[in-house]
From Swiss-Prot:
Cofactor: Mg(2+); Mn(2+)
UniProt-listed GO biological process terms: adenylate cyclase-activating G protein-coupled receptor signaling pathway; adenylate cyclase-modulating G protein-coupled receptor signaling pathway; cAMP biosynthetic process; intracellular signal transduction
Subcellular location: Cell membrane; Cytoplasm
Source organism: Homo sapiens (Human)
Gene transcribed to yield this protein: ADCY4
E.C. no: 4.6.1.1
Stated name of the protein: Adenylate cyclase type 4
Length: 1077
């Protein structure tokens, strides 16, 4: 209870709620309250006129009602401006309450004899509406309710106490009034507490939904950015659908297909130019770099190249070590694709020349360009990378390999498309590359018109930089210079600004402040000013607040039917009606308090006939049975040990909370019991057959004035039966989640029954009470305000309409709460799906252990990711026969069907990665028909140094088994495709540097001598064999594998190396093989 009456905390989110609360509930309810009061006052005048009374004969009544009409009309005018109400909420609410209270006290002394039961229903109305309809806090409402109760009791006690005629019955009546008012206060507190709890829950759900929506939008942006960092937009939609299908089918598995092939996302494009560029001298420079320097250097270089590519409408395809290749004319055809690539190549050479001139480091750029047609898309299931394939792509690669450092080497096809834009000279170097020599076509070197100018300008600066750099390592000097280029960091967009907002993140103070400020202004103003001051997230918040406004129920809604409030979706309506209501037992408990109040009142004001006592006893037992069913689970918790035969009892309360049919039956029965017991005392009145006021004797009513009232007739209980009926109306409002149509039916039923009883069948009791009070003929009857049956009927109608308004609003908010919870649940599920999609996309770019470095930790963006490893096993596995198999003809759709087979090979290789035994294998990339993977990358930094050599290289065995599994997969594909492809594998292990480079298309890669040698082991290998270096052979020997020497072979860039073949026919054995060593 202390929490109910404690002052609200001042945080701005609570201020948000207060503003929302006044907008959504209190503003319309206050207007409706004033409207009901005005209608009731008008009804009083109409009833007085309809009952045959002369309005001018009772000037006090007429004056009171007319003044009240004027005063409440003025209050309605003051409250009709929402911003005024928000600014003056408490004073205006207090003024309305004081006006209601003053009107009630005026009614007490207007129209006739003052009695203890006068205006009790009216004061009950004031008490209940102070909680339910006035915009007051719980503490203020409680003060208003108690003050209303005490004022009525004190005024009547002080006024009637000195009168000897009324003194004997005064105390029981005042006690009955106190019970009525206490019950009204309890019902009001209960209603307000539950409504505030429901409203706060709805508000929190709305805020949570807003946060989830923001988070969902952020995740969508992230996954869109990630998807576009892997693929062009035209393929992104198809690939996204593929990933979503994989998510639904289970991570790592591919969805069921209507055919036996994996999905192929490759298309043919004609009229494109392909550029290959290689940094000459970078391998030697990289060997001198620290891991951080190497990754920074590569990121800056390729970041610069990406910028150049963007300027010249080129699209980077891949980074292969220090090799960079891109295309122009994809995904949209461009007429100047050849010129674009040549310009880009020249700009790349210029950038490297400036770098060399500024640092004195001996590096250069070799560029090759060819124009033709390509097959472009992605293959495989993991580590998707947009790639291009065709004979023209192969030729472009050889153009780079056979080119001249610092020059752009082009083919005749490209030259024809330049249309004289650049001067060229004959390359005359076909002898440098066997492929070009075999092709036999002339090639050309583009003459850069600005090269000589730049050389002259850069000579002095280059010499000066070289002298200054003598004291500094070339790699460090180069790193320092490249930092000035300021290339963006990979995944920079995931590290700040638009990072996902958690559901617990508070709204910004700016939004909170602007909310209270803006809504204190006239809302009829154009919202443009508001939109100018708020960002998109804030604007969405205001849209949510508007949706929470209860006035929306009277407007068109896409979720509700405005008349019935039913959900427009039938499934949602069914789900709402079948939803559980755990608080139903508290509805029953509070209704039981109303029943007890009625019982106490009846015992105070009646003669307590035995039949009434028996009826109440039976009803009391029925109530206890209902409460036992509702609270059986709570009762069983109190009894730790009980008979096993009673262990089924807790299920009863669960059934009540979850079964709507049972709830409706119990709720309806409870309300009907309260209604029935409120009027039961009327049927136990001792009556006389010659009573002139009973219906059969109405014609003799005037002539029979000599008839005497029985002295034992407890007529004072008649108005209290009406008051008990009013409490019966209140019992309907206690069932917050009861459907509006059922409440309407019960209220209509009770209104008809009450009016029928007190205006027709038992109206004679009211007439008898008037005769007894006024001791005179009926023509001296009192005013409307003192006639029990008329005031009782007016009270019934007032409570009927008041509770009908509250019932509709309760229904709206119950449904709104359900709707927001459902939306929040759906948005959270969608957000979770998007997060999984983002994670999958990120893991398609980065290894699983690297991805958290860029997302989920709000990582600082100052440093590039890099990691050095002491022992990593690198695998290159190629299908050399595929080059001969690949052809471009009409039969195979210009090579598309050949790529379909390559896609099957790579996809089957990728499927092996999902097996637990190969969880340590990380796919790096594919280069044509070559598959690159590594193990040992998930080890933490320094871990290898802390373990012995045997354990640190244990993952080499995993890689060998993976290589063998690749061969087995290829054998299966050969069997089904009637081919005889064979795998050529190269393995090497040692230290590597891993990192993420490239802001436009972030790419995870590994570098180092280990990688270069592993590549040479594959390219110099033998079909069907796994070739390894001598050091790797010794490591595998220690793990139980058998290797035999191939001898000394010449390896490009490495000289003479002694290599070994792994005996893949043998599994691990105990003793080492003698063939090694």
């Amino acid at each position: 209870m202390a929490r109910l009456f404690s002052p609200r905390p001042p945080p701005s989110e609570d201020l948000f709620y207060e503003t929302y609360y006044s907008l959504s509930q209190q503003y319309p309810l206050l207007l409706l309250l004033l409207g009901i009061v005005l209608c009731a006052l008008a009804a009083l005048l109409a009833v007085a006129w309809a009952s045959g009374r002369e309005l001018t004969s009772d000037p006090s009544f007429l004056t009171t009602v007319l003044c009240a009409l004027g005063g409440f009309s003025l209050l309605l005018g003051l409250a009709s401006r929402e911003q005024r109400l928000q600014r003056w909420t408490r004073p205006l609410s207090g003024l309305v309450w004081v006006a209601l209270l003053a009107l009630g006290h005026a009614f007490l002394f207007t129209g006739g004899v003052v009695s203890a039961w006068d205006q009790v229903s009216y004061f009950l109305f004031v008490i209940f509406t102070a909680y339910a309809m006035l915009p007051l806090g719980m503490r203020d409402a409680a003060v208003a309710g108690l003050a209303s109760s005490l004022s009525h009791l004190l005024v009547l006690g002080l006024y009637l106490g000195p009168q000897p005629d009324s003194r004997p019955a005064l105390l029981p009546q005042l006690a009955a009034n106190a019970v009525l008012f206490l019950c009204g206060n309890v019902a009001g507190v209960y209603h307000k507490a539950l409504m505030e709890r429901a409203l706060r829950a709805t508000f929190r759900e709305a805020l949570s939904s807003l946060h989830s929506r923001r988070r969902l939008d952020t995740e969508k942006k992230h996954q869109e950015h990630l998807l576009l960092s892997i693929l062009p937009a035209y393929l992104a939609r198809e690939m996204k659908a593929e990933i979503m299908a994989r998510l639904q089918a289970g991570q790592g598995s591919r969805p069921e297909s209507t055919n036996n092939f994996h999905s192929l996302y490759v298309k043919r494009h004609q009229g494109v130019s392909v550029l290959y560029a290689d940094i000459v001298g970078f391998t030697r420079l990289a060997s001198e770099c620290s891991p951080k320097e190497l990754v920074l250097m590569l990121n800056e270089l390729f970041g610069k190249f990406d910028q150049i590519a963007k300027e010249h409408e080129c699209m980077r395809i891949k980074i292969l070590g220090d090799c960079y290749y891109c295309v122009s004319g994809l995904p949209l055809s461009l007429p100047d694709h050849a010129i674009n690539c040549v310009r880009m190549g020249l700009d790349m050479c210029r950038a490297i020349r400036k770098l060399r001139a500024a640092t004195g480091v001996d590096i250069n750029m070799r560029v090759g360009v060819h124009s033709g047609s390509v097959l472009c898309g992605v293959i495989g299931l993991q580590k998707w990378q947009y790639d291009v394939w065709s004979h023209d792509v192969t030729l472009a690669n050889h153009m780079e390999a056979g080119g001249v450092p610092g020059r752009v080497h082009i083919t005749g096809a490209t030259l024809a498309l330049l249309a004289g834009a650049y001067a060229v000279e004959d390359a005359g170097m076909e002898h440098r590359d066997p492929y070009l020599r075999e092709l036999g076509e002339p090639t050309y070197l583009v003459i850069d018109p600005r090269a000589e100018e730049e050389d002259e300008k850069g000579t002095a600066g280059g010499l000066l930089s070289s002298l200054e750099g003598l004291k500094m390592r070339p790699s460090l000097l180069m790193t320092r210079y490249l930092e000035s280029w300021g290339a963006a960091k990979p995944f920079a967009h995931l590290s700040h600004g638009d990072s996902p907002v958690s559901t617990s993140t508070p709204l910004p103070e700016k939004t909170l402040a602007s909310f209270s400020t803006q809504w204190s202004l006239d809302r009829s103003r154009t919202p443009r000013g508001l939109d100018d001051e708020l960002d998109t997230g804030d604007a969405k918040f205001f849209q949510v607040i508007e949706q929470l406004n209860s006035q929306k129920q009277w407007k068109q809604s896409k979720d509700f039917n405005p008349l019935t409030l039913y959900f427009r979706e039938k499934e949602m309506e069914k789900e709402y009606r079948l939803s559980a209501i755990p608080a139903f037992k508290y509805y029953e408990a509070c209704t039981f308090l109303v029943f007890l109040s009625n019982f106490i009142i009846q015992m105070l004001v009646t003669n307590r006939p035995p039949a009434l006592a028996i009826t109440y006893s039976i009803t009391f037992l029925l109530f206890l049975l209902i409460l036992f069913v509702c609270f059986s689970e709570d009762l069983m918790r109190c009894v730790l040990k009980g008979p096993k035969m009673l262990h089924w009892l807790p299920a009863l309360s669960g059934l009540v909370a979850t079964r709507p049919g049972l709830r409706i039956a119990l709720g309806t029965a409870t309300i009907l019991l309260v209604f029935a017991m409120a009027i039961t005392s009327l049927f136990f009145f001792p009556t006389s057959s010659d009573c002139p006021f009973q219906a059969p004797n109405v014609s003799s009513m005037i002539s029979n004035l000599s008839w005497e009232l029985p002295g034992s007739l407890p007529l004072i209980s008649v108005p209290y039966s009406m008051h008990c009926c009013t409490l019966g109306f209140l019992s309907c409002s206690l069932f917050l989640h009861m459907s509006f149509e059922l409440k309407l039916l019960l209220l209509l039923l009770w209104l008809a029954a009450s009016c029928s009883l007190f205006l027709h069948s038992h109206a004679w009791l009211s007439e008898c009470l008037i005769v007894r009070l006024y001791l005179g003929p009926l023509d001296s009857r009192p005013g409307v305000l003192k006639e029990p049956k008329l005031m009782g009927a007016i009270s019934f109608f007032i409570f009927f309409f008041t509770l009908l308004v509250l019932a509709r609003q309760n229904e709206y908010y119950c449904r709104l709460d359900f709707l927001w919870k459902k939306k929040l649940r759906q948005e959270r599920e969608e957000t979770e799906t998007m997060e999984n999609l983002t994670r999958l996309l990120l893991e398609n770019v980065l290894p699983a252990h690297v991805a958290p470095q860029f997302i989920g930790q709000n990582r600082r963006n100052e440093d590039l990711y890099h990691q050095s490893y002491e022992c990593v096993c690198v695998l290159f596995a190629s299908v050399p026969d595929f080059k001969e198999f690949y052809s471009e003809s009409n039969i195979n759709h210009e090579g598309l069907e050949c790529l379909r087979l390559l896609n099957e090979i790579i996809a089957d290789f990728d499927e092996l990665l999902s097996k637990p035994k190969f969880s340590g294998v990380e796919k790096i990339k594919t280069i044509g028909s070559t598959y690159m993977a590594a193990t040992g990358l998930n080890a933490t930094s320094g871990q290898d140094a802390q373990q012995d050599a045997e354990r640190s290289c244990s993952h080499l065995g995993t890689m060998v088994e993976f290589a063998v599994a690749l061969g087995s997969k290829l054998d299966v594909i050969n069997k089904h495709s009637f081919n005889n492809f064979r795998l050529r594998v190269g393995l090497n292990h040692g230290p590597v540097v891993a990192g993420v480079i490239g802001a436009q298309k972030p790419q995870y890669d590994i570098w180092g001598n280990t990688v270069n040698v592993a590549s040479r082991m594959e390219s110099t290998g033998v079909l069907g064999k796994i070739q390894v270096t001598e050091e790797t052979a010794w490591a595998l020997q220690s793990l139980g594998y058998t290797c035999y020497s191939r001898g000394v072979i010449k390896v490009k860039g490495k000289g003479q190396l002694c290599t070994y073949f792994l005996n893949t026919d043998l599994t691990r054995t105990g003793p080492p093989s003698a063939t090694l060593g």
